[in-house]
Amino acid sequence: MKKNVLAAAAVLAALAAFEHAASSARAADAAPTKLWEAQGLANPECALADTKAGVIYVSNVNGDAMGKDAKGYIAKVSLDGKKVEKWVDGLKAPKGLAISNGHLFTGDVDELVEIDIAAGKIVAKHKAPGAGLLNDVAADDKGNVYVSDTGGGGVFKLSGGKIEKWLDVPEAAGANGLAIEGGNLIVNTWGVLTGKGFETSSLGRMLSVSLADKKVTALDGGKTVGNLDGLASLGGGNYLISDWMAGKVMKFATGGKMEEVLDLGQGTADFGYDPDSKIIYVPQMMKNTLTAYKMQ
């Protein structure tokens, strides 16, 4: 009897060890692979890959995130990370980026700046009335451009050359990352600001907002998620998000389930994601780098 018990215990121990090893192997297989790291940036906040043009646009705050000293600029980085060049300068503290009809838009403190890509020149600065801190940008297929107001809450919309507050609800306090998904604008938030810098009294949320009637639907099951920044839709109710303060990139599933993808340290900002190649381009504001990872 004793021998049988010992034998059974040995088998169970072996099975547990095997499962642990298999689990570790699966985790290793699923971990993103680092492809390259580009240096020479200045507090990079957002990366946007235009694979057809063979370039990654990167906004550089270059100082105070709320500053208006015209030190900010947009850089162009090659898809292999080997070439970094300053492209458009004279900005305040540019953040989110989106392309629409051959123009690159960036949230620049209190203005939505419009850049003609072919000319490499600023063609318009759309002053957002009452904006606290404009941040991420998204464009729909009708040419409308949306920009989050992290400082003042909610979202502005540029349509027909006119910019106005489009969404102003309590749930969107500290609105940050934006992504168009079908007929909805996906919004993640930094959290409710206390008025002391970027300190929050409660963490950020994951929301879906109907473009047709502005109906807000919670994707997080009513639970707070983090000091959210980057956002990309993976389809099927799944998203990639970044938590700037925690320094992590995570997979988020509607309902609130999360899985850590990368742990890179504080300052992990508004990444760019190319779904075709499954490459994520992560700007590190505190390290002045842009790093590319291949997702599994």
Language-model segments: residues:
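Glycine/small-residue-rich hydrophobic helix-like segments
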Residues: S201-E260
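A short loop-to-beta-strand structural motif that recurs across blades of beta-propeller domains
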Residues: G72-A75, E111-V113, G154-F156, R205-L207, ...
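A short beta-strand motif characteristic of beta-propeller blades
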Residues: P32-A38, K82-V88, K121-K127, I163-D168, ...
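Bacterial N-terminal signal peptides that target proteins for export
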Residues: M1-A9
